[in-house]
Amino acid sequence: MPRYRLTIEYDGRPYNGFQAQASQPSVQGAIEAAVKAFTGQTIRIAAAGRTDTGVHATAQVVHVDLERDWPAETVMNALNAHLVREAISVLDAVVVSDDWHARFSANERRYLYRILNRRAPPALERGKVWHVKKPIDADAMQTAAQALVGLHDFTTFRDMACQAKSPLKTLDVARVSRVGDEVHLVFEARSFLHRQVRSMTGTLAEVGVGRWTADDVMAALEARDRTACGPVAPADGLYLTGVGYEGEG
């Protein structure tokens, strides 16, 4: 039974998150329905990450096991044909070994958060950015973000419903930069806690608008207390932009 690695792009707005749910539209459910329409198989896909409602992806990675040995390009084209009415696209399909796993073989996940920082609201990007009217100091955010890099107890930035056994995570990259009218936050780590990225983003935004200092961010991290977190940024501006695997650049 050949295993296929699929790279997926999607707009998270129409879906109640990635994970399949019986009575709500989901990214996983749409992809699995497309596989069934193509092959007749009822399957479960595995994903590198399960994004929340409204969160987008430019390079989510999933794998699927098919009964027939189809050419990878045929799989990609067929799934896209069945996903044409969905806000989902298969960007690439590759045959991988049976022991390769989209989630457990991953050693890095990359997220981008987009803040639109101008007075005028978004007309074309509504639901795809967080609109913040007050001027943001991206340099101050970048300085404060460095306190989060490294191995830490991220209890402060962990959702109360998070099911991870440990709050310890190693954040490899936290980078903030201004790109025109937008402020971009990039985070890279092997894995993240539930809503960790949005919690860090909302907290750093408090620094950007002058309500918090870098020392406040450090104090919040060291408090190991969810109530010490700043506001949680909305899902709108968050994108899963890449998943890294050993041996890949």
From Swiss-Prot:
MF (Gene Ontology): RNA binding; tRNA pseudouridine(38-40) synthase activity
Gene Ontology process terms (BP): tRNA pseudouridine synthesis
- What Pfam families does its record include? PseudoU_synth_1
Binding residue positions for substrate: Y111
Asked whether the UniProt record includes Cell membrane among its keywords, one would answer no
What reaction does this catalyse? uridine(38/39/40) in tRNA = pseudouridine(38/39/40) in tRNA
> Oligomeric state and partners?
Homodimer.
PANTHER family in the record: PSEUDOURIDYLATE SYNTHASE (PTHR11142), TRNA PSEUDOURIDINE SYNTHASE-LIKE 1 (PTHR11142:SF0)
The role this protein plays is: Formation of pseudouridine at positions 38, 39 and 40 in the anticodon stem and loop of transfer RNAs.
The protein depicted here goes by the name tRNA pseudouridine synthase A
Give the originating organism.
Caulobacter sp. (strain K31)
